[in-house]
């Protein structure tokens, strides 16, 4: 189809107008500079205004119009010409600023006694510098414009197969395999018309057809061929007939090359080289039936001949064989998230011991001396948020006597809270942590640049923040192996979860680590949708969350079966072995399950969720499945003993009471934290928790990183069949064929209490609300409890 000439006509019209405008504006600017031509006519007004405003820099305006006109005149304009056009505003601003700067320099030199020759030399140097700067800017615009163009188009993967389908003139590669023609299904029949392409025949060597084999298979040639027509079936002939060419007598040149034709329709080895022959000069009266040829529809992509089974050799023409796709690019190849996506904040210096810190040390000694405890300051370590004073207590003093003075020390130092560590692990001293007057910001970008020594060898490195000494704290989630995060609202829990996910996105590609995000609050993790690391879209419903965890349990058992077959103890050994022996195509990825508000799921699902989580925590470490549970309500019914026993690594943010701190860490201390990322991290290798200031990640940084990761590739979600909607198999535990196994236990609960309600059964049996309501309805149907009694519990009718 021919292109419309209208766009070209419009471009030439606008180009002519711009060219005429450039000439007129140049004359309007230059002519008033001469004595013979005054700027009194209206023609000279635009040039006069430009010159009075921008002086000689105004000559760049008609130059811009002329350049734009040339671009419109020339159809095949270059990339550098377009880059120069885009860079014009920068060149114009530079010229104007440089010229005004030169005039200011002249006025400054006018008050000095400088010779005219020196002034002229200064003017020449300034003009040359300005021209050099303009040339450098133009050169940079041309170079970086081309680089930006290449970078932008390199991010858009080209589909060469699709390009071949869209461009019928794409020449196929037929050097390795000669063209062949299908033998006729019968040696003789009525004369049939052989269709040729509508246009003139293409050059020699651009046709290829399919050759049926004896075993019901077809040979994939270098290109896919779509049969144009099917000739009528012919009767059988007992004697073999020589194959006639499928070329009409009026054809200007043969459609097939002369050598390589099959000489007989008898069964023969398809891989045997065909004997050379020549086309007969006379077409027989009864030409054998052959399949009409059609132009090649796609370029060659198959590297070698491939055999695939066919349905039936005798049922019509063979089915066209689709071209096999080229091997996909490995998703991890070149995966990298730039550091520039993160914001750079001003660096705060907090390492130095200033006079204020020394005064606090003196006040600390004075405070303890008021209670007849003579302590000695042996060290001061200043961190981004708190400063730790190391005290050496006198002999014979109980540590409990010192720790009980936390509130008195806070009052004396005018601090919001003071935490006393008695003793400091591994030291002969007591630590007193006092908040700094000015908190320093710990950024995620800073910690990415200053990694710890062993972070490169970690399987799943996670950046937490800095400790009280200012050292970066990076943990390996694969060694943790599970993590519990708890803290009150506004303590920094959500920022910690975002920093954890961001650490995975920066260090691991989608083929190395997969994420399963569960967000009952709906708004916290929704922004991570459509990234390639996700197994499923972010789950917000409790029912789908439990079904996803049940799928992970099945995946865990499948991985254990794979490890058993290769006699491996963990996923690291398995991936190493399959790589050495080339057993599998790609290693097993790690799976990280992040549940943002675990308390809401426990209320909705109850016992089933606790059982699934406990089983995953107990068994999934060896197969590379790790859990991160976050909650803001660290009560005993949410963080049960079964879950705590299987999650030894925990992070506690600021909580409201000592009891909450004991539930999380099994000790006090979290109630003394400052909030805004101040945390206590406890792992199995340490007997005392470590105080850390969490890394800060803003929402703008998250949006930029997620947008970059989304552009890398699309996610491959699990099949939606794992999220079944059948009420008979829902998470509430509906049993059709038989009674609920918990029915007898529920009857005993209501008979012992003398009252029956859905919420009471739900709390006592630790089950979901739907299942508890179904148990109450079943008791009512069997006459155990009475009908609903408004807001009061039901009456127990039978004991």
UniProtKB/Swiss-Prot annotation:
It is found in: Cell inner membrane. The chain crosses the membrane at residues 14-34, 55-75, 85-105, 124-144. Homohexamer. Forms a ring that surrounds DNA. The gene is ftsK. ATP binds at residues 490-495. GO terms for molecular function: ATP binding; ATP hydrolysis activity; DNA binding. Residues 145-799 are cytoplasmic. Consists of an N-terminal domain, which is sufficient for the localization to the septal ring and is required for cell division, followed by a linker domain, and a C-terminal domain, which forms the translocation motor involved in chromosome segregation. The C-terminal domain can be further subdivided into alpha, beta and gamma subdomains. The alpha and beta subdomains form the DNA pump, and the gamma subdomain is a regulatory subdomain. Keywords: ATP-binding, Cell cycle, Cell division, Cell inner membrane, Cell membrane, Chromosome partition, DNA-binding, Membrane, Nucleotide-binding, Transmembrane, Transmembrane helix. Essential cell division protein that coordinates cell division and chromosome segregation. The N-terminus is involved in assembly of the cell-division machinery. The C-terminus functions as a DNA motor that moves dsDNA in an ATP-dependent manner towards the dif recombination site, which is located within the replication terminus region. Required for activation of the Xer recombinase, allowing activation of chromosome unlinking by recombination. Residues 470-662 form the FtsK domain. It is a multi-pass membrane protein. One of its GO terms (biological process) is chromosome segregation. One of its GO terms (cellular component) is plasma membrane. This is DNA translocase FtsK. Belongs to the FtsK/SpoIIIE/SftA family. Residues 167-208 are annotated as: Disordered.
């Amino acid at each position: 189809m021919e292109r419309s000439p209208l766009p070209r006509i419009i471009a030439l019209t606008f180009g002519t107008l711009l060219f005429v405008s450039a000439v007129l504006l140049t004359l309007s600017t230059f002519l008033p500079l001469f004595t013979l031509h005054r700027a009194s006519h209206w023609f000279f007004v635009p040039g006069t205004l430009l010159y009075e405003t921008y002086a000689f820099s105004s000559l760049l305006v008609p130059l811009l119009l002329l350049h734009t006109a040339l671009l419109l005149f020339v159809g095949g304009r270059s990339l550098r010409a377009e880059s120069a056009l885009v860079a014009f505003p920068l060149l114009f601003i530079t010229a104007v600023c440089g010229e005004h700067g030169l005039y200011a320099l002249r006025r400054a030199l006018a008050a000095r006694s400088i010779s005219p020759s020196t002034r002229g030399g200064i003017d020449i140097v300034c003009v040359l510098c300005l021209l050099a700067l303009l040339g450098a800017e133009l050169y940079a615009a041309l170079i970086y414009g081309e680089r930006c163009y290449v970078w932008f188009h390199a991010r858009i993967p080209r589909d060469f197969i699709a390009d071949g389908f869209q461009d019928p003139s794409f020449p196929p590669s037929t050097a390795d395999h000669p063209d062949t023609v299908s033998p006729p299904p019968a040696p003789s029949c009525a004369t049939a018309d052989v269709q040729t392409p509508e246009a003139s025949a293409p050059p020699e060597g651009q046709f290829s057809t399919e050759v049926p084999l004896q075993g019901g298979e077809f040979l994939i040639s270098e290109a896919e061929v779509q049969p144009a027509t099917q000739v009528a079936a012919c009767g059988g002939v007992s004697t073999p007939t020589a194959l006639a060419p499928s070329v009409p007598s009026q054809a200007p040149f043969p459609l097939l090359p002369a050598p390589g034709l099959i000489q007989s329709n008898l069964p023969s080895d398809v891989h045997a080289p065909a004997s050379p022959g020549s086309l007969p000069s006379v077409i027989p009266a009864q030409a054998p039936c052959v399949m009409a040829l059609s132009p090649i529809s796609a370029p060659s992509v198959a590297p070698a001949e491939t055999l695939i089974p066919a349905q039936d050799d005798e049922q019509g023409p063979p089915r066209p064989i689709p071209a096999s796709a080229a091997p996909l690019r490995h998703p991890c190849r070149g995966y990298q998230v730039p550091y520039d996506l993160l914001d750079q904040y001003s660096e705060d210096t907090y390492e130095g011991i200033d006079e204020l810190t020394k005064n606090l040390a003196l006040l600390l000694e004075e405070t303890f001396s008021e209670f007849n405890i003579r302590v000695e300051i042996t060290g001061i370590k200043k961190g981004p948020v708190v400063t730790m004073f190391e005290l050496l207590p006198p002999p014979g003093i109980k540590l409990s006597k010192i720790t009980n003075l936390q509130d008195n020390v806070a009052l004396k130092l005018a601090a919001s809270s003071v935490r006393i560590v008695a003793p400091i692990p591994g030291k002969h001293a007591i630590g007193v942590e006092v908040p700094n007057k000015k908190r320093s910001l710990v950024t995620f970008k800073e910690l990415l640049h200053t990694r710890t020594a062993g972070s490169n060898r970690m399987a799943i490195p996670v950046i937490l923040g800095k400790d009280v000494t200012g050292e970066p704290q990076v943990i390996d989630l694969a060694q943790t192996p599970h993590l519990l995060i708890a803290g009150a609202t506004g303590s920094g829990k959500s920022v910690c979860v975002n920093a954890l996910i961001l650490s995975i996105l920066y260090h691991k590609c989608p083929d190395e680590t997969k994420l399963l995000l569960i967000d009952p609050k709906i708004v916290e993790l929704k922004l991570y949708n459509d990234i390639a690391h996700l197994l499923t879209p972010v789950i917000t419903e409790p029912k789908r969350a439990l079904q996803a965890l049940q799928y992970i349990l099945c995946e865990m058992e499948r991985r254990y079966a794979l490890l058993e077959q290769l006699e491996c103890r963990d996923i690291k050994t398995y991936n190493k072995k399959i790589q050495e022996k080339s057993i599998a195509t790609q290693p097993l990825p790690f799976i990280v399950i992040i549940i943002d508000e675990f308390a809401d799921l426990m209320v909705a699902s109850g016992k089933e969720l606790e059982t699934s989580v406990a089983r995953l925590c107990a068994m999934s470490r060896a197969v590379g499945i790790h859990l991160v549970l976050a909650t803001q309500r660290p009560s005993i019914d949410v963080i049960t003993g079964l879950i705590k026993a299987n999650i030894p690594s925990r992070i506690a943010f600021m909580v409201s009471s000592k009891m909450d701190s004991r539930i999380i860490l099994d000790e006090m201390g979290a109630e003394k934290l400052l909030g805004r990322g101040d945390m206590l991290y406890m792992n199995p290798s340490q007997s005392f928790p470590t105080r850390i200031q969490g890394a800060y990640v803003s929402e703008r940084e998250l949006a930029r990183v997620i947008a970059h990761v989304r552009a890398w590739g699309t996610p491959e979600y699990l099949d939606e069949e794992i999220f079944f909607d059948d009420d008979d198999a829902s998470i509430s535990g509906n049993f059709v064929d038989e009674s609920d196994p918990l029915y007898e236990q529920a009857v005993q609960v209501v008979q012992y209490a003398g009252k029956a309600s859905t919420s009471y059964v739900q709390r006592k049996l630790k089950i979901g609300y739907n299942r508890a309501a179904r148990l109450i309805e079943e008791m009512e149907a069997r006459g155990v409890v009475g009908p609903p009694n408004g807001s009061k519990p039901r009456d127990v009718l039978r004991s």
